[in-house]
């Protein structure tokens, strides 16, 4: 293992450096002041202890903001065991602070793939045996999949999983369709206070930050291609426009494509007439030959494929802000081109062939975070105020599922409850209200007459489930 720890009385952890705990604690205290919804829930439910008896397996980016989430879950009665869902996203001072607080955590920045899986296994196991967990909190679906495939007996006691991100939700829905999902799931990703905050506004803040930290480039006046215009793509395009970049967007969904046009972005395709036949002949080389930066945002595979990578402008920056590293064909890059590490999570990819390279060669791409999440690999991710909404949703989702006690139901009832659903809108509004209060905002209350006129209660929820914010 590459991580080093300092032995102590509590040893159910593995982090990079336990001496970073004081630094992590100082940052956590600051983060708490920027997370009003999460801290509001901590105060609101402290006496009730709604998670007393909950034993939560967590796999989500081990950042300072996650430390606030973990300690909120613990404050509301839960026991937790934690790992990170990405090999580069851990903030080592955050992991150290959690370990120093006596909470089991296995995470450090720069894990290998083998170490990543080992860390997840260590949270599942306690004293060498499967822990008697009864809840899962996941980001991306790796933990959920491992439990289903390697430790299926644990599922008999687990009440459900709350999933943070688009990719993980897709995996859950796929498992449900195939009859493989054995526990109910809450789709946290599609809560309005998650998707509109984290996916859109968070990426607007953190994408340009990561690119500038990784490259020290001035972005203004350069051309960028954003692949995908969902919520993450929207925030990413805004992030680059803020820097003065000339931003183009490519999309497969006509509705998202229309939105890109309406928002003033040029809609293009890296493929001639939009058709990818898998050959270099289908590539719009004139377009890609002018692109200085390409960002993938889709959650799909090979959206920046080998033929596109060959056609990109010399010295173009390539990065991904989707969950996994397969959006960019990094496998092709590793097999066919030479990699030169400039600094951690920044590589020059020499397109002159594999093996030896000329350091003065100018035909290279700059790849950030090895094609993984750039905002967490090259920077510190979304700000605390953004993650406040996402993590408040996670807390409410954990309370909601734990209260349902799925594992204790009769088989017939279990069949009815085996679903992947979003949080009730009333809980989404609860998170939003706490966030508004954190900004010092004042929400106007409906009169009884007004509420009756539009067919809602004075307390809400205020919109139908089908409403698109």
From Swiss-Prot:
Any idea which UniProt keywords this protein has? Cytoplasm, Hydrolase, NAD, One-carbon metabolism
Stretches that traverse the bilayer: none
The yes or no answer to whether the keyword Cytoplasm is present is yes
| Chief location | cytoplasm
| NCBIfam families tied to this protein | ahcY, PRK05476.2-3
Its pathway, per UniProt, is: Amino-acid biosynthesis; L-homocysteine biosynthesis; L-homocysteine from S-adenosyl-L-homocysteine: step 1/1
**Compartments in which it is found:** Cytoplasm
Q: Which gene encodes it?
A: ahcY
CC cofactor: NAD(+)
Source superkingdom: Bacteria
Which Pfam families has this protein been placed in? Answer: AdoHcyase, AdoHcyase_NAD
Give the family this protein belongs to, as stated in its UniProt record: Belongs to the adenosylhomocysteinase family.
Protein name (Swiss-Prot/TrEMBL): Adenosylhomocysteinase
Q: What is its EC number?
A: 3.13.2.1
- Copy out the cofactor comment: Binds 1 NAD(+) per subunit.
Task: List the record's Gene Ontology CC terms alphabetically.
Answer: cytosol
């Amino acid at each position: 293992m590459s991580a080093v720890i300092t032995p102590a009385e509590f040893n159910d952890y593995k982090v990079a450096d336990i001496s970073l705990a004081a630094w992590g604690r100082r940052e956590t205290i600051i983060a708490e002041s920027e997370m009003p919804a999460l801290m509001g829930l901590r105060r609101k439910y402290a006496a009730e202890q709604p998670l007393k008896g909950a034993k939560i397996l967590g796999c989500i980016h081990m950042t300072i903001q996650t430390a606030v989430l973990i300690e909120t879950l613990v404050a509301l009665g839960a026991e937790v065991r934690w790992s990170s869902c990405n090999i580069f996203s851990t903030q080592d001072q955050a992991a150290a602070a959690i370990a120093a607080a006596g909470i089991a955590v296995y995470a450090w920045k720069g894990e290998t793939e083998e170490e990543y899986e080992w860390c997840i296994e260590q949270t599942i196991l306690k004293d060498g045996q499967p822990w008697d967990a009864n809840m899962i909190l996941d980001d991306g679906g790796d933990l959920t999949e491992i439990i289903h495939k390697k430790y299926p007996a644990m599922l008999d006691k687990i009440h459900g999983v709350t999933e943070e991100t688009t990719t993980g939700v897709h995996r859950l829905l796929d498992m449900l369709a195939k009859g493989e999902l054995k526990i109910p799931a809450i789709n946290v990703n599609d809560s309005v206070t998650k998707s509109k905050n984290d996916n859109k506004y968070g990426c607007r803040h953190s994408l340009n930050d990561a690119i500038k930290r990784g490259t020290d480039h001035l972005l203004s006046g350069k051309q960028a291609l954003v692949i995908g215009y969902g919520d993450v793509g929207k925030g990413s395009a805004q992030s680059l426009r803020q820097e003065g970049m000339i931003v183009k967007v490519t999309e497969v969904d006509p509705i998202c494509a229309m939105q890109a046009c309406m928002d003033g972005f040029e809609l293009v395709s890296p493929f001639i007439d939009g058709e990818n036949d898998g050959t270099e002949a289908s590539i719009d080389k004139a377009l890609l030959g002018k692109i200085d930066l390409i960002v993938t945002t889709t959650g799909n595979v090979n959206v920046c494929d080998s033929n596109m990578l060959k056609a990109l402008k010399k010295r173009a920056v390539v990065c991904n802000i989707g969950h996994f590293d397969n959006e960019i064909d990094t496998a092709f890059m590793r097999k066919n081109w030479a990699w030169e590490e400039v600094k951690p999570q920044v590589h020059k990819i020499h397109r002159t062939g594999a093996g030896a390279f000329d350091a003065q060669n100018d035909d290279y791409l700059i790849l950030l975070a090895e094609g993984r999440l750039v905002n967490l690999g090259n920077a510190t991710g979304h700000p605390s105020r953004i993650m406040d909404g996402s993590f408040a949703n996670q807390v409410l989702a954990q309370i909601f599922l734990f209260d349902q006690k799925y594992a204790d139901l009769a088989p017939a009832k279990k069949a009815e409850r085996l679903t992947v659903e979003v949080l009730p809108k009333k809980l989404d509004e609860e998170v939003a209200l706490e966030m508004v209060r954190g900004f010092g905002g004042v929400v106007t209350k409906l009169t009884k007459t007004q509420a009756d006129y539009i067919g809602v209660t004075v307390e809400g929820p205020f919109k139908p489930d089908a409403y698109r914010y």
